[in-house]
């Protein structure tokens, strides 16, 4: 269910070219070394097929955490303070020149459809920290997706209750860790002097991602004890042998509690959606201020808003959360013997999802183009889940439609034959919705810090150099074959093997 982020890539950078440390001379060299590991890990992760990328996420997270220790030490040294807060030895870092670092945005809208947005050049260590922490939070969200993927695969045996509980609990913890990182960035963004170089690390986007991660974690708390998605998944699973499985009844109090939790998730998603739309509208308005300097495809990255797929995902998550709340209100009403109100709540949920009532309640007699299209889209989504590709881009909307349609068909049949209760309109029921109830609290993020022994060892002069001036680009390797020497040649002797102007003739 979490959003399928695409991790960014970055260019090579040498800290020694822009920073010098008098108290700990080896700090810039070590920071460059660990940043090179992050750059190489992100490059290798991007080149992997989608089915294999989940296995490298742990390496990405570990490399970023190792690099953050040195990056935060350099950041503390610029302010002439200790990286351990109020205690510990002080670091003195001098800024020699503005750093020139490039990052590829992963949430900004692209000027050319179907292509990646161009790289953004940053000249601030604060923006480097924002990109690094945002990448870490995105990697944690992707780890949560990888943990939840086995619960949605219908071509293998259904995981047991213990495996399901462990997967949801682990994914919830990862999402809350990501939310704490975004909360740390949101607090730190208040001290920024200039505008963000792109929409990915702007204060509005960071706050929106915090709300999004909190909404996803809240829905997972409901999903942990919600038996109906499991019933629908088992019904679609050909390998499931327990075909007579009956969904356990949810107590009335818990159904009402789950509904309020879903409403809280909907409120968080609505807040994230408004922040993203404000960011996109401000980005769109900024594109007209540049005059002739921002023509065609050469417009500035700061003038572009967020990716439309990301904004649509947040809106779908808001709709899905409200539809889940309507479903739990329906379960609460059905447990109380109010079948008519239960059916009305289900139809209110379909209205929130944008599904027309006539399509959800009509009899399945004969062939229908809409029915064929729906089955084809469901099979395509199942293949995405099996391959580990960009599944769940609809934020669980299709799954919730299946659950509501199953309950609507069951209760409508009971109401037509036995109860015969009046079904209220969705507008009447939606006006009675209570407020949401939060379950999770975002804990303060504790950035990693260098061990005092390691920090003391960097008082020694550096051994070697961190000059990455001739380092190849992370995505452009192999594109410029002219810069490489012939196979088997000794480094630095390329000109001796090349053909000069005087040797163009055969003799």
Curated annotation (Swiss-Prot):
The taxonomic lineage of its organism, from the top, reads:
Eukaryota, Fungi, Dikarya, Ascomycota, Pezizomycotina
Acidic residues compositional bias, start-end: 464-478
Q: Which residues form the BRO1 domain?
A: 1-294
Biological processes annotated in GO: cellular response to pH
Q: Where is this region: Disordered?
A: 437-507
Q: Where is the composition biased (Polar residues)?
A: 498-507
Query: What is the scientific name of the source organism?
Result: Pyricularia oryzae (strain 70-15 / ATCC MYA-4617 / FGSC 8958) (Rice blast fungus)
Q: Which family does it belong to?
A: Belongs to the palC family.
What is the official name of this protein in its record?
pH-response regulator protein palC
Q: Name one GO cellular component term.
A: plasma membrane
The record's listing under InterPro entries reads: BRO1_dom, BRO1_sf, pH-resp_palC
Q: What does it do?
A: Required for the proteolytic cleavage of the transcription factor RIM101 in response to alkaline ambient pH.
């Amino acid at each position: 269910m979490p959003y399928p982020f695409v991790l960014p890539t970055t260019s090579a950078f040498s800290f020694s070219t822009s920073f010098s440390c008098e108290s700990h001379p080896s700090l810039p060299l070590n920071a460059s070394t660990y940043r090179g590991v992050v750059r190489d890990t992100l490059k290798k992760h991007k080149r992997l097929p989608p089915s294999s990328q989940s296995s490298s996420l742990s390496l990405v997270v570990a490399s970023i955490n190792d690099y953050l220790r040195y990056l935060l030490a350099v950041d503390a040294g610029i302010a002439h303070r200790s990286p351990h807060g109020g205690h510990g030895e002080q670091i003195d870092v001098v800024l020699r020149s503005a750093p020139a670092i490039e990052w590829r945005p992963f949430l900004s809208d692209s000027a050319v459809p179907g292509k990646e947005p161009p790289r953004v050049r940053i000249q601030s260590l604060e923006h480097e920290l924002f990109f690094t922490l945002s990448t870490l939070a995105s990697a944690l969200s992707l780890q949560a997706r990888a943990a939840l993927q086995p619960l949605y695969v219908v071509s293998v045996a259904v995981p047991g209750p213990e495996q399901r509980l462990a997967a949801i609990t682990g994914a919830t913890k990862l999402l809350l860790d990501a939310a704490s990182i975004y909360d740390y960035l949101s607090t730190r963004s208040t001290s920024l002097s200039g505008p963000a170089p792109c929409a990915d690390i702007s204060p509005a986007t960071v706050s929106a991602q915090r709300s999004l991660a909190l909404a996803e974690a809240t829905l997972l708390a409901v999903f942990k004890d919600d038996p109906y998605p499991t019933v629908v998944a088992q019904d679609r699973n050909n390998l499931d042998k327990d075909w007579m499985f009956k969904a356990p009844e949810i107590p009335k109090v818990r159904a009402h509690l789950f509904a309020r939790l879903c409403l809280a998730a909907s409120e968080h998603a609505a807040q994230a959606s408004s922040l993203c739309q404000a960011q996109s509208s401000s980005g769109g308005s900024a594109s007209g201020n540049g005059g002739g300097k921002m023509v065609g495809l050469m417009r500035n990255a700061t003038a572009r808003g967020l990716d439309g797929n990301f904004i649509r995902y947040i809106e779908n998550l808001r709709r899905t959360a409200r539809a889940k709340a309507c479903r739990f209100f329906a379960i609460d009403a059905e447990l109380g013997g109010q079948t008519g109100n239960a059916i009305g709540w289900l139809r209110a949920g379909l209205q929130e999802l944008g599904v027309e009532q006539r399509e959800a309640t009509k009899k399945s007699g004969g062939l229908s183009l809409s029915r064929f299209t729906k089955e084809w889209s469901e099979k395509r989504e199942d293949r995405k889940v099996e391959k580990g590709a960009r599944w769940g881009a609809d934020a669980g909307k299709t799954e919730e439609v299946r659950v509501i349609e199953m309950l609507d068909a069951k209760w409508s049949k009971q109401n037509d034959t036995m109860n015969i209760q009046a079904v209220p309109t969705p507008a009447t029921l939606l006006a009675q919705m209570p407020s949401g109830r939060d379950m999770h609290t975002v804990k303060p993020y504790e950035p990693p810090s260098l061990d005092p022994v390691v920090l003391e060892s960097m008082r020694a002069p550096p051994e070697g150099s961190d000059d990455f001036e001739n380092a190849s680009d992370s995505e452009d390797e192999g594109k410029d074959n002219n810069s490489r020497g012939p196979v088997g040649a000794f480094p630095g002797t390329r000109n001796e093997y090349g053909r000069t102007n005087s040797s163009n003739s055969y003799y």
